[in-house]
Amino acid sequence: MVNNMTDLTAQEPAWQTRDHLDDPVIGELRNRFGPDAFTVQATRTGVPVVWIKREQLLEVGDFLKKLPKPYVMLFDLHGMDERLRTHREGLPAADFSVFYHLISIDRNRDIMLKVALAENDLHVPTFTKLFPNANWYERETWDLFGITFDGHPNLRRIMMPQTWKGHPLRKDYPARATEFSPFELTKAKQDLEMEALTFKPEEWGMKRGTENEDFMFLNLGPNHPSAHGAFRIVLQLDGEEIVDCVPDIGYHHRGAEKMGERQSWHSYIPYTDRIEYLGGCVNEMPYVLAVEKLAGITVPDRVNVIRVMLSELFRINSHLLYISTFIQDVGAMTPVFFAFTDRQKIYDLVEAITGFRMHPAWFRIGGVAHDLPRGWDRLLREFLDWMPKRLASYEKAALQNTILKGRSQGVAAYGAKEALEWGTTGAGLRATGIDFDVRKARPYSGYENFDFEIPVGGGVSDCYTRVMLKVEELRQSLRILEQCLNNMPEGPFKADHPLTTPPPKERTLQHIETLITHFLQVSWGPVMPANESFQMIEATKGINSYYLTSDGSTMSYRTRIRTPSYAHLQQIPAAIRGSLVSDLIVYLGSIDFVMSDVDR
């Protein structure tokens, strides 16, 4: 049952419940490195933000990793062009900065380290010596900002083509297509691009063969159906055995973070739907919550429950596609057609509520676009009566099949240590026995008031365990929806706050000031206070987060989007070496990713 629904509005926003400036880790750092070794930044992230010197980076990182309750996961790493930022009071001088977001599972706490860099000295030591998953994040930061990570094993472009000129997330780099010269693809340029895509094993430390035999290098993708999108993996093969492999991403990159600098806080909402295009409203949740932290908005009870309801509907929708396509990858065709019948019922419900199907863009800063329509409860009731029996049939007919089990049990298996090293989240992490779901560990949007369980594996994450956890997660989402149906609070669907966007239109009819405010917020967008905010959520494929920097304008100064699929694809070589090509196909199906979530 849902508890204390009417008490939600009396609670402080989650980022205010614990003062991150007094986090115990700050004292531990001061005791070890001295009180003047770093600068603590006050933000609305809810996370301790500590500026340290470049020379201290590896030492501080190693210290945090070896604490009694250690920071065991590098959750995110990226940069920012600080040159045009006007509100930097009390911060170290910087033209650029690099941030490192670490998570401690034991503490259920985070810390963010920042390093200030001058434009004429954009160098920082690589973090890969402490966290192997820093590899791709450092490549992306160099690709998009031009910051060099000394000692990196292979610092090369990852999002942009190898022939690309410039670093797109710099403030002096054009943000609109109209600012570029017209694009022309000549024969010479086409040949150059094709040559750049030619795989050269030596660049990756690979040998072309041994004394007795040559290795085969095979492209899987970027248009192979089992790659689940525009994704290439170059395989180094000894017969059918995978000696090593190199994932190649970026074909779906659209510059989503750059777009955040040219859209208003309100008009960026539709772009969030397309980060992970199966997640719908789930994608909107972290962005809208992060903006509401900046604005200091607390939404009504009804908004919280509506948001949870839409998020869980899209979670079920995504999980159904994942489970059925996994079964299809292993070789059974029928379940995917049944799943699309079930997903259609969800789309009918979502369309009735929001007016759209896949990409509703329905959450708003301070609420939702409009109230629930008449009859929504009947449609939800019909779906809740329908789905449990269908789910049982999937399990019985396909997931308990001995051939499927034989193809997936023990394949691409890893433990908790490996999952944490590679930044794995979601079912892949929980399959290793680590009980970490943001909805329970760090509740948002009122999840703490719902009664549901978090499925956890027995210690080893393999293909079969990952898919079976998703089946149980689907059941738990049905439990949450049942509680939304039975306990939907009355009340407004928007917060009564000056920065709620769009503001209530009824007030525009009363006097001119409200009409002017409404016009400005709808046309130019709301002006958010200068600060930084952060929100992570349990998305359909793992932990998704938005880290927003406001410089006191109508647009974000920096929008950082951390997606789970990016981290999960980086882990592929470590998990699949020594396996067969057929095992790789099953492994890819078990990850649950879409390339829009990877490439952004």
Curated annotation (Swiss-Prot):
Question: What's this protein's name?
Answer: NADH-quinone oxidoreductase subunit C/D
- Assembly behavior: NDH-1 is composed of 13 different subunits. Subunits NuoB, CD, E, F, and G constitute the peripheral sector of the complex.
An annotated GO cellular component: plasma membrane
The family line of this record is: In the N-terminal section; belongs to the complex I 30 kDa subunit family. In the C-terminal section; belongs to the complex I 49 kDa subunit family.
- Using the UniProt annotation, give all residue ranges assigned to the region (NADH dehydrogenase I subunit C): 1-190
Gene3D superfamilies with a match to the protein in the record:
Cytochrome-c3 Hydrogenase, chain B, NADH:ubiquinone oxidoreductase, 30kDa subunit
As its record notes, the protein acts as a catalyst of: a quinone + NADH + 5 H(+)(in) = a quinol + NAD(+) + 4 H(+)(out)
Q: Which UniProt keywords apply?
A: Cell inner membrane, Cell membrane, Membrane, Multifunctional enzyme, NAD, Quinone, Translocase, Transport, Ubiquinone
Q: MF terms per GO, please?
A: NAD binding; NADH dehydrogenase (ubiquinone) activity; NADH:ubiquinone reductase (non-electrogenic) activity; quinone binding
Give TM regions.
none
Q: Which NCBIfam families match?
A: NuoC_fam, NuoD, PRK06075.1, PRK11742.1
The listed locations are: Cell inner membrane
Q: Where is this region: NADH dehydrogenase I subunit D?
A: 214-600
Q: What class of enzyme is it?
A: translocase
Q: Per its UniProt record, what InterPro entries does this chain match?
A: NADH_DH_suC (IPR010218), NADH_DH_suCD (IPR023062), NADH_Q_OxRdtase_suD (IPR001135), NADH_quin_OxRdtase_su_C/D-like (IPR037232), NADH_UbQ_OxRdtase_30kDa_su (IPR001268), NADH_UbQ_OxRdtase_49kDa_CS (IPR014029), NADH_UbQ_OxRdtase_CS (IPR020396), NDH1_su_D/H (IPR022885)
Role summary = NDH-1 shuttles electrons from NADH, via FMN and iron-sulfur (Fe-S) centers, to quinones in the respiratory chain. The immediate electron acceptor for the enzyme in this species is believed to be ubiquinone. Couples the redox reaction to proton translocation (for every two electrons transferred, four hydrogen ions are translocated across the cytoplasmic membrane), and thus conserves the redox energy in a proton gradient.
Indicate the principal place this protein occupies in or around the cell.
Answer: membrane
Q: How does it sit in the membrane?
A: Peripheral membrane protein
Q: Which EC number(s) does the record attach to this protein? A: 7.1.1.-
